[in-house]
A protein has these predicted regions:
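Glycine-rich, acidic
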Residues: 211-212, 216-364, 368
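Glycine-rich phosphate/pyrophosphate-binding beta-alpha loops
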Residues: 29-37, 277-278, 401-409, 413
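Glycine-rich, acidic/polar active-site loops that bind/position phosphate-bearing ligands
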Residues: 183-210, 230, 282-287
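Short glycine-/aliphatic-rich beta-strand segments at the starts of folded cytosolic domains
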Residues: 129-155, 224-246, 367-377
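Acidic, proline/glycine-enriched N-terminal capping motif
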Residues: 24, 51-172, 177-179
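C-terminal catalytic lobe of FAD-dependent flavoproteins
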Residues: 1-70
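Glycine-rich, small/acidic residue-mixed loop/short-helix segments
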Residues: 336, 340-429
Length: 429
C-alpha cells in the first residue's frame, strides 16, 4: 500500500483510463505519502508495469521528492547575481547620472544619497530639493460603498473628507497593532487616492481585495503603484519654484496644508499633494510613470536657477526625525499599539465595527506603560546605534528605534521607547 491505495484500486484506475503513469499517480496518490516515493517507488513501478504492459523502466512514476532528495536553489546558476528580482523607478538612470548611491528597499533600488546626507538636509532646510518617491504605493478606491468600506478597513473617519482634501491615516491589524501610515485624498468626487509606504503597498492592496470578498461592498480597487510615479519637492523656495513652471496658485490661502490639487505641466497630468514628511514646506507631485524620466530632468533643469538639488532616503530619515515623525516597522514592532506610538488621534472609535476595534478598546482601557517619544542628545554625544537600550539609574528601561545627527540643530536626535511615566519633555536618560 501507499497512501492506503491497494493493488485493486490501482487496477481499477487503469481500467478507467488512467493508464499513463503520471496520471495514475495523481489520480490514486501513489507515491505521495510521507516518504514521497522513497519506500514505495520501486514497488509502484513494478505494479504499474504489470498492469499496463510497460517495462518497469518505462513505468517509473517520477523521481523521489523532498525530503528524500531535497534540491537546493543554490544549484541554479548565478542565483545571487542573476535571480534576485530588482525594481527600478522610471528615474533610475537619472539618479545614476547624478552619481547616486543606491539603497535596497525590498526589491526596489532607491536613491540613498547623492552627496553627504548632512549637506543634502541643509539644502532642504535652506533652499529647495527633490526626492524620488515613485516607490510609494498608490491605491484608488471608488464605488457606492467606498466610505463604508474605508470605515471598516481603517480606524479613522472619511465621510467629511471633501474633494481636494488630504488626511493622515493609519492602518491596524485585527489585533489592534499599528502596521502602516499614509494619506488618503479625495481627488475627484467619489474617488479616493491612498498613498502607502513602499514596503506595504502590495500587502495593503491584497488586504483590500481579500476583505472585499468577505463583505457585501460595491467598491472598485485599483493598484496604480506601477503606473504612477512621483517626486517630493520641498524647502523654503519650493513655492517660488513651482509657481514659475506650473499654472497653479500655490499660495497658502489657495493651496493649504493637507490639501490636493490637479494641474498639467507641458501637457502631463499632475496630482499635487501638500504634505510635510520632511517638516518643511513641500509638495508631492504624482504623474504617469512614462513621463518620470523626462519630468525629473525638466524639474532639475528649471530648478537650477533656484538651487534645486536632489536628496535621498538617508536625508529623508534625518529630516523626518527633525520633525518627529515615526515610521511604522522601524519605530514600532509587533507589540506597538497606536496609543503608545502617539498616533491615537487618527482613531475614531465612535463608529460601527472596524478592523481591530475590540483590541483598541482593550488598549484604551489599559494604563499606557510605554510611549514612543522623540529625544535629543547633548552636543558632542555619540550617536547611538538603532536598537540600543535606554538606561535610567543603571537599568535598561527602553530602546532607541532611530537616531541620526541633525545638521540643522547641531546635535543628535532620534526616537525611543521609554516608560510612560518618564515620557514628558525634559526627562533625562
Amino acid at each position: 500500500k501507499c497512501m492506503d491505495v491497494t493493488r485493486k484500486e490501482a487496477c481499477m484506475s487503469i481500467d478507467e483510463g488512467f493508464d499513463q503513469v503520471e496520471s495514475l499517480k495523481r489520480y490514486t496518490s501513489l507515491g505521495m505519502g510521507p516518504c514521497q516515493g522513497k519506500s514505495c517507488h520501486e514497488a509502484v513501478a513494478r505494479l504499474a508495469a504489470m498492469d499496463t504492459g510497460l517495462t518497469a523502466s518505462d513505468a517509473v512514476p517520477t523521481t523521489m521528492r523532498p525530503p528524500a532528495f531535497p534540491v537546493s536553489f543554490g544549484l541554479l546558476s548565478g542565483r545571487a547575481h542573476h535571480l534576485g528580482p530588482i525594481r527600478r523607478t522610471p528615474m533610475h538612470h537619472c539618479h545614476i547620472d547624478l552619481g547616486v548611491k543606491f539603497l535596497d528597499a525590498g526589491a526596489w533600488k532607491r536613491p540613498d544619497s547623492y552627496m553627504d546626507p548632512q549637506q543634502e538636509a541643509l539644502y532642504v532646510r535652506k533652499g529647495v530639493a527633490m526626492i524620488d518617491v515613485s516607490t510609494l504605493g498608490k491605491i484608488e478606491l471608488s464605488g457606492p460603498d467606498v466610505i463604508e468600506f474605508m470605515h471598516f478597513m481603517l480606524p479613522g473617519k472619511f465621510a467629511k473628507l471633501d474633494v481636494g482634501r488630504t488626511r493622515y491615516a493609519i492602518m491596524i491589524g485585527e489585533d489592534g497593532i499599528l502596521f502602516e501610515d499614509g494619506t488618503i485624498s479625495q481627488i475627484e468626487k467619489g474617488k479616493y487616492y491612498i498613498s502607502t509606504t513602499t514596503g506595504n503597498q502590495d500587502a495593503i492592496y491584497t488586504l483590500f481585495q481579500w476583505w472585499l470578498t468577505t463583505g457585501d461592498y460595491d467598491v472598485q480597487v485599483k493598484n496604480l503603484s506601477a503606473g504612477i510615479s512621483g517626486v517630493n519637492i520641498t524647502g523654503p523656495k519650493v513655492r517660488e519654484f513651482l509657481s514659475s513652471i506650473i499654472d497653479l496658485d500655490f499660495s497658502n490661502e489657495a493651496f493649504p496644508y493637507m490639501h490636493n490639487r490637479q494641474a498639467t505641466l507641458e501637457g502631463v497630468p499632475l496630482n499635487l499633494f501638500r504634505i510635510g514628511f520632511t517638516g518643511e514646506l513641500g509638495y508631492e507631485i504624482h504623474f504617469p510613470s512614462e513621463f518620470g524620466e523626462s519630468l525629473w530632468n525638466y524639474f532639475m533643469e528649471k530648478g537650477e536657477s533656484f538651487g534645486l538639488k536632489p536628496f535621498g532616503v538617508e536625508t529623508q530619515r534625518i529630516l523626518r526625525l527633525e520633525k518627529g515623525h515615526l515610521i511604522p516597522g522601524a519605530d514600532t514592532d509587533a507589540l506597538s499599539n497606536p496609543y503608545e506610538a502617539g498616533v491615537g488621534f487618527a482613531i475614531k472609535d465612535d463608529k460601527e465595527d472596524f478592523i481591530g476595534k475590540a483590541f483598541l478598546a482593550e488598549f484604551k482601557q489599559r494604563e499606557i506603560e510605554n510611549r514612543l517619544v522623540p529625544y535629543r542628545l547633548q552636543e558632542g554625544d555619540t550617536i547611538p546605534i538603532d536598537g540600543v537600550a535606554v538606561i535610567a539609574e543603571g537599568k535598561p528601561v527602553g530602546r532607541v528605534t532611530s537616531s541620526r545627527m541633525s545638521p540643522t540643530l547641531g546635535y543628535g536626535i532620534g526616537m525611543a521607547w521609554v516608560p510612560a511615566g518618564s515620557s514628558e519633555a525634559g526627562n533625562h536618560f
